[in-house]
Swiss-Prot record:
Identification of the protein by name: Methionine import ATP-binding protein MetN
Source organism, top-level taxon: Bacteria
Gene: metN
SUPFAM superfamilies from the UniProt entry: ACT-like, P-loop containing nucleoside triphosphate hydrolases
Lineage, top ranks: Bacteria, Pseudomonadati, Campylobacterota, Epsilonproteobacteria, Campylobacterales
GO molecular function, one term: ATP hydrolysis activity
Positions of ATP binding: 35-42
Stored InterPro entries: AAA+_ATPase, ABC_transporter-like_ATP-bd, ABC_transporter-like_CS, ACT-like_dom_sf, MetN_ABC, MetN_ABC_transporter-like, NIL_domain, P-loop_NTPase
Keyword Protease: no
Subunit structure: The complex is composed of two ATP-binding proteins (MetN), two transmembrane proteins (MetI) and a solute-binding protein (MetQ).
Xref: SMART domains: AAA, NIL
Length: 351
């Protein structure tokens, strides 16, 4: 549905916002693009509907070469791409009905067709009873629902969400995400969602990529990335070790024989550790554990300290891997993290 190849963006002042971006979003995907402020996320999503122009690269949406379109053709194609923003962008002098109708007026819909379409959209987002309300009379969540209805007005195939929940409280965020998920399923939309909130990715997305310093540093299914984040930025964003685990590990004098065991999908609820203990006659201390509920399933984490010979431990770990479980040696991982931090300190001093 959406395909970007070798996309670069350099501004006239020389600032490089995007570096060789390759990204593909399939029909029906909810792709979460996450990163810290200034990473290039918003530039990337604005290139998809050409609110920003790339310096180089190719961009296709629904098989159409977006960069080869003239202005009138671009306007027609943009009707297939809905977009919602952090700050709603509603017209204060228009009521809810007229804010949604505005998108249809711009697209030159027949006047007789506008009312039934707006009524349909307001029912979809749960605002039928507030059609005559003005933006000043709405809560933040209600304003975003109006913005969603407006973005869907022209039957788009793609929905772009630029920090759509970052101005909302936690409860309202959950309701908006539930609405977006329901709409995506009903309409079969492809959704690209920009956020710095990992909870948003966990709640709604099936795919994700991590952007840092203008480049995609990690990508994959949400379950894969949450289970085994590889890049240091990803680990920071998803809190690779929850606070309780980090606290426990920081107080361990010796990380030898300490492993993180990651269970995904159906494995999250199987008694594999107890089976392993019986099968291989090993003693194990469970230092911490948790289960993350994702939009596509669950990911469970246990931090285990083995009290066993190296041979028994290795056989037990091999058996766990054969059951579909991922294993991470925290001793080795902490050593690698220390090396990265040391390199960063050396580089910063050199600068």
């Amino acid at each position: 549905m959406i395909k970007l190849n070798h996309i670069n963006k350099t501004y006239p002042n020389g600032f490089v916002a995007l570096k060789n971006i390759d990204l593909e979003v399939a029909k029906g995907d909810i792709m979460g693009i996450i990163g810290y402020s200034g990473a290039g996320k918003s530039t990337l999503i604005r290139i998809i509907n050409r609110l920003e122009e790339p310096t180089s690269g190719t961009l296709f949406v629904d098989g159409v070469n977006m960069l080869g379109l003239k202005q009138k053709e671009l306007q027609m194609q943009r009707q297939k791409i809905g977009m919602i923003f952090q700050h709603f962008n509603l017209l204060s002098a228009r009521n809810v009905f007229d804010n949604v109708a505005f998108a249809l007026e711009i697209a030159k819909w027949d006047k007789k067709a506008i009312k039934p379409r707006v009524d349909e959209l307001l029912e979809l987002v749960g605002l039928s009873e507030r059609a005559s309300f003005f933006p000043s009379q709405l809560s933040g969540g209600q304003k975003q629902r109006v913005a969603i209805a407006r973005a869907l007005a022209n039957h788009p195939k793609v929905l772009l969400c630029d920090e759509a929940t970052s101005a909302l409280d936690t409860k309202t965020t959950k309701s908006i995400l539930a609405l977006l998920r329901d709409i995506q399923r009903r309409l079969g939309l492809s959704v690209v969602l920009i956020t710095h909130q990992i909870e948003v990715v966990r709640e709604i997305c099936n795919k994700m990529c991590v952007v840092s310093d203008g480049a995609i540093v990690e990508r994959g299914s949400v379950a894969e990335v949450f289970a085994a984040p590889k890049h240091p930025i990803t680990r920071e964003l998803i809190s690779f070790l929850p606070q309780d685990e980090g606290h426990i590990i920081s107080h361990l004098k010796d990380l030898h024989n300490v492993y993180k065991v990651i269970f995904t999908g159906p494995y999250a609820h199987l008694p594999l550790v107890s089976q392993m203990i019986r099968e291989f006659d090993v003693d194990v201390n469970i230092l911490s554990g948790n289960i993350d509920e994702l939009a596509t399933g669950e990911v469970g984490h246990l931090v285990l300290k083995f009290i066993a010979t190296d041979d028994k431990r290795d056989k037990a770990l091999s058996w766990l891997k054969e059951q579909g479980v991922s294993i991470e040696d925290l001793n080795l991982m902490c050593q690698n993290t220390d090396s990265i931090q040391l390199s960063q300190k050396i580089e910063s001093k050199a600068v």
